[in-house]
Amino acid sequence: MATILTLAGDGIGPEIMTQAIDVLNAVNDKFALGLTLESGLIGGVAVDSTGEPLPEETLQRARAADAVLLGAVGGPKWDGIERSKRPERGLLKIRSELGLFANLRVAKLYPQLVNASSIKPEIISGLDLLIVRELTGGIYFGEPRGIRTLENGEQQGYNTMVYSTSEINRIGKVAFELAQTRAQAAGTAAKVCSIDKANVLEVTELWKQTMIELQQSEYSDVALSHMYADNACMQLIKDPKQFDVMVTGNLFGDILSDEAAMLTGSIGMLPSASLDEAGKGMYEPCHGSAPDIAGQDIANPLATILSVSMMLRYTFKQEAAAQAIEQAVSDVLDDGLRTVDILDRNEAGLIQVGCQQMGQAVLAKLI
């Protein structure tokens, strides 16, 4: 029997997690998956309860679990505390401690939401791209880092961006193999676009060269292209459907995946997976804790529900259950139900609903 650790976290985390758990329990019963759910603390609520953003008990339970489902962490309540104790440090630590090096973010536009995007329909209709982000290296984890006082009394902040060939090869393999899988399913040619700033950063010059060597030695059937990060930001808006799989480092991936989220109409629609080398993972929505709307029953639970779908697909290899959730989400959108973030007030026949009503509507499609 497999175990899933749920970590609701802060802000809207508990609201969206409640809906995701209901959906998970439904598919667990319907497909006889044999999954057991546990819960734990992370982020600000963990700081309030234990003094630590990632309590040792939570970390040990996460290590023992087969997968982790996360809501959201952080909020202004904890902005003034010591940096090492802030909620976001718990998220960084659990990723690092579990070896979750590969972050997968799917930017898929549901046809029902084409008018919710700020981009012209002809540019984004049919969008389905995957961003593979290296998650445990780069400038977010590089040492040395800190804030120091210079001899003249001025303060200076500094960080280090560093990648080894083994780290680059590891994330590259994930990207190339996912491109092969996606191409086989779609009946298209496999392609990967590697994002760097090799023109100014030596670390990404190594990134680019390592990707080239990996493709030539092991993945010659996958077309590999390269793009500077600043141009990639522009091209995502200009012509997003030119991409299938994008692979990049931690910092650029953080920026590009949030940009890609808005192509779909709302970051509230985007799930993500963070995987280790064995396929064990942590699954979470791409959005943050949104403390400004917490407790108001207006958050969009669909990204978290779709994160459950990704979990079933990538960790538990339950494709039928994963597709059932995705179809249920699509059916609810067909019914015209919209949370406020994806509501087009100029489109007739739409029904504004809250977090709970949206989640229960998806659940009803699965029962």
Swiss-Prot record:
GO terms for molecular function: 3-isopropylmalate dehydrogenase activity; magnesium ion binding; NAD binding. The record marks 140, 197 as: Important for catalysis. Binds 1 Mg(2+) or Mn(2+) ion per subunit. SMART domains: Iso_dh. Pathway: Amino-acid biosynthesis; L-leucine biosynthesis; L-leucine from 3-methyl-2-oxobutanoate: step 3/4. Gene3D superfamilies: Isopropylmalate Dehydrogenase (3.40.718.10). The keyword Magnesium applies. It comes from the Bacteria. This is 3-isopropylmalate dehydrogenase. It comes from Psychrobacter cryohalolentis (strain ATCC BAA-1226 / DSM 17306 / VKM B-2378 / K5). The gene is leuB.
